[in-house]
Amino acid sequence: MFFQFLLLLAAAHNAFAKCRCTPEDDCWPSASKWNALNNTVAGRLILDEPLAKACYPGPGYSESKCRSIAENWTDEYWIAKSPIGYSYPLVDTCPPINASIPAYPSCELGNSPIFSIDATRPEDVATGTKFAKANNIRLVIKNTGHDISQRSQGYGSLSIWLRNLQSGLQLHKNFSPSNGSCDAKWNGSAITIGGGYVWQDAYDFAAKRGHVVVGGGDPTVGCIGGYLQGGGHGSLSHEFGLATDQVLEYQVVLASGKNIMANACQYTDLFTALRGGGGGTYGVVVSATIKTYPTRPTLYNSLTITGLQNDSESVLNATARMISKFPAIVEEGFAGTSLMGKTDGVWVYDAPFIKFLTNDSSEAITHAKEVMNREIINELLPGNGTKYHVDSQWQTYRSWHEWYGAVPHTTPGANQPMMASRLFDKGSLVSRQENLTELVHILSTSGSHLTSGSFMIMNIVAGGKVLEKAPHTSVNPAWRKAYLLLQQVDFLAANAGSAETKKAKDRLTTTKLAAMKELAPGMGTYVNEADSWDPEWRKDWFGDEYDWLLSVKRKYDPDDVFWCWRCVGNEG
């Protein structure tokens, strides 16, 4: 069972666990201390209970509630409404019994926090931080729960839940730093995101004012948490840079409980660390101000390749050829996220490409289509109808927001996913076609008997402005050479035991990730979409920035009040 695998994770944390008080220890805070904390945060301390508790015999059992839970079990909006709702992976130590995953004989919190503070003010964050430090208990930070590495979870911990800390969204026509003492190198428009808003909120707010912001593909992901602090990519990052490149200012609660503003003028080292060095470890960001840009027309191409029965080779080979062409279309301004996997036993490649147009003149649109046809679609046509079916559709939208609203972006919560990824530079894509084809086959077919399914994600979100290092950023330097972020996602079988789980994980790390590294040596990956068991995680996730980031961590959090799995400062 997957819970047994989580126990392996807990064992890996054992050295740290001995340093923090847990509910089994005499040093665990007394009921009176928890009551006092609850009073200080105005009754917003939550004793966490498993999401599906209503499905199990005992107090709280409800057949109707259980039915509702099962119906919403993979709905990301529903998941985010709980202080212990996690999208990747779903907490499966207490699944709804009538959901499409096997029931377990007991219902437990597992790795979820014991208590959560439903923070609505920065003062609540400061209170929770100081309480955790004073009582030597583990502290975790959670917004919406999109974290495949489980960094917002922690056994026996106190969680600060930021989803309901929402002080508003504010547009600045001409930005200047809070203290105005230095030049921020940006006097254009900006938006301050005050707390636990999601990208859909920010996109809607910006669109009503004729603007766009660089954010994530999934509208349910939180704006100012690990996504932004770890780099952040999306359909507009090629045009304007990574999401973290857009940050002009952070409001941060430090490990001491102090509430400060970090920007290019003050707390500059902390500001830099929070622009790419990962979330959950330097302080708690409660507000961020990011750049905005005028919206423009958007050209959209929907490309689908559907394999014929009993022919897997053709789609895999065609996918490899297309990947080798990505740098050419990236340099013409195209972006997008493609997926390839099996649907009803047939290989399907689905690629939504977009181009953020400077104008919607017929000349601009014709040129963009010519590039896509020349580099991608014409390459596929010889096999159309004999090896696979190709479908290509074009659509022009008046604005980026209109395109975003017309195309599905929300992904369901996934049970027991495992991910590995790698950033690829131009040379590794265009000059090693044979190796690239071999890689696609390894990722798609190796170890398939160990998983219940898998798919490959090709994120064309780099190149362009991403290649330009923005001042005061600490993102993995590999991003500044990257044209593609390639991800492999494998799903454990629902009934996988600990032995099967270990085999699947080992295959992902030692075979699939290793093959990616071999094709793109000297690169790295995106900290938020990486293999949690990569033995070279410091180098692969942070590159040459790690040692400097660690020095910032030690400066602002010498007692490790903030500690999370595979975060800077996690030396276990």
Regions found by a protein language model. Name each.
Residues 1-17:
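Fungal secretory targeting signals
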